[in-house]
């Protein structure tokens, strides 16, 4: 299921977990390598496209009712 904005996420997994509405996992870096205080935050379109593109598609496919994705099926 998706994590609400402000909810805890695991910074050791990756930067883009299933945060609601295309959010991303934002952490503080301590000493350059320890991640702490990781929370789901709203990302700008640039951040979202850079780190969350593939993950958002996976989240949307696994739980479309709870995740909003920019990837809607295109009609040809």
UniProtKB/Swiss-Prot annotation:
Record protein name field: Omega-agatoxin-Aa3b
Cited Pfam families: Toxin_34
Tissue specificity of this protein: Expressed by the venom gland.
Subcellular location: Secreted
Protein family membership: Belongs to the neurotoxin 04 (omega-agtx) family. 03 (type II/III omega-agtx) subfamily.
Alphabetized InterPro entries for the sequence: Omega-agatoxin_II/III_CS, Toxin_34
Role this protein plays: Omega-agatoxins are antagonists of voltage-gated calcium channels. This toxin blocks calcium channels in insect central neurons but not at peripheral neuromuscular junctions. In vertebrates, it is broadly active against all high-threshold Cav1/CACNA1 channels and Cav2.2/CACNA1B channels.
This protein's UniProt keywords: Calcium channel impairing toxin, Disulfide bond, Ion channel impairing toxin, Knottin, Neurotoxin, Presynaptic neurotoxin, Secreted, Toxin, Voltage-gated calcium channel impairing toxin
Keyword Phosphoprotein: no
Written domain comment of the UniProt record: The presence of a 'disulfide through disulfide knot' structurally defines this protein as a knottin.
Cellular component terms (Gene Ontology): extracellular region; host cell presynaptic membrane
Source species of the chain: Agelenopsis aperta (North American funnel-web spider)
Further facts: Negative results: does not inhibit Cav3 (T-type) channels.
Top-level lineage group: Eukaryota
Disulfide bonds: 2-19, 9-25, 16-52, 18-40, 27-38, 59-67
GO function terms (MF aspect): calcium channel regulator activity; toxin activity
């Amino acid at each position: 299921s998706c994590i609400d904005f402000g909810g805890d996420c695991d910074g050791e997994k990756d930067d883009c977990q299933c945060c609601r509405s295309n959010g991303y996992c934002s952490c503080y870096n301590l000493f350059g390598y320890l991640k702490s205080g990781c929370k789901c935050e709203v990302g700008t379109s640039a951040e979202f496209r850079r780190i969350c593109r593939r993950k958002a598609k996976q989240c949307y496919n696994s739980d479309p009712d709870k995740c909003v994705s920019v990837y809607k099926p295109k009609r040809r």
